[in-house]
């Protein structure tokens, strides 16, 4: 592992050094070696994809740490750093989840974020799927997003609920392929339900973003 660490961690260590933060960098390096240890020693030699994913992980973390003002750099709490690294090693290949872990790790180095960090965040991230992560990012960027229900109302009276929750994370030009995940109503509904269960979003069917109306299909 020792011969692989310099390649993977040099950029991060260099960034921290320019901020006069050798101690936090050393803490991270030692934590990485302790957590990933023999697992990566084997996988990095046998799997080029694993090496690539690790490098992208550190690259993302480095970019985020570079944005932290020098005066805000702090020694990360091991109670955040350790569990986050431990959990993330099983999600390295999932880019969307990996990005969230990188953001959490970067925040642990930022004193201005200390009051916002909570130890439960690691467990919450572990319960996210890649689709959950993409949908959460989509919603966070827009603050409010529309959801809908599909109901059939019969002329004779009565209703039939076709879809209890419809969420389409669409922005820009609609893609022609109906295989795109944005049109997978059931998966997106399950994703939104999970995000609400975790307390990350709130689904509200009582507030309308536009005028309430019914669409009649003949």
Please identify what each model-predicted range represents.
Residues 116-180:
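Short amphipathic alpha-helical interface segments
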């Amino acid at each position: 592992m020792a011969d692989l660490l310099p390649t993977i961690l040099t950029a991060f260590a260099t960034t921290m050094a320019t901020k006069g933060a050798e101690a936090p960098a050393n803490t991270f390096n030692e934590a990485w070696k302790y957590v990933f240890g023999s697992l990566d020693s084997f996988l990095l030699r046998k799997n080029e994809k694993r090496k690539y994913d690790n490098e992208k992980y550190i690259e993302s973390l480095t970019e985020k740490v570079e944005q932290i003002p020098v005066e805000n750099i702090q020694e990360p709490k091991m109670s955040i750093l350790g569990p986050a690294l431990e959990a993330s090693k099983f999600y390295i290949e999932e880019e969307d989840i990996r990005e969230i872990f990188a953001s959490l790790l970067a925040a642990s180095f930022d004193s201005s974020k200390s009051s916002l960090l909570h130890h439960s965040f690691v467990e919450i991230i572990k319960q996210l799927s890649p689709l959950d992560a993409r949908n959460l990012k989509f919603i966070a960027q827009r603050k409010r997003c529309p959801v809908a229900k599909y109901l059939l109302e019969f002329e004779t009276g009565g209703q039939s609920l076709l879809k209890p929750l419809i969420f389409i994370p669409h922005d820009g030009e609609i893609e022609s392929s109906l295989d795109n995940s944005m049109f997978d109503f059931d998966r997106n509904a399950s994703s939104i339900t999970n995000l609400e269960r975790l307390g990350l979003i709130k689904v509200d069917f009582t507030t309308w973003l536009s005028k309430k109306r019914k669409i009649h299909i003949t």
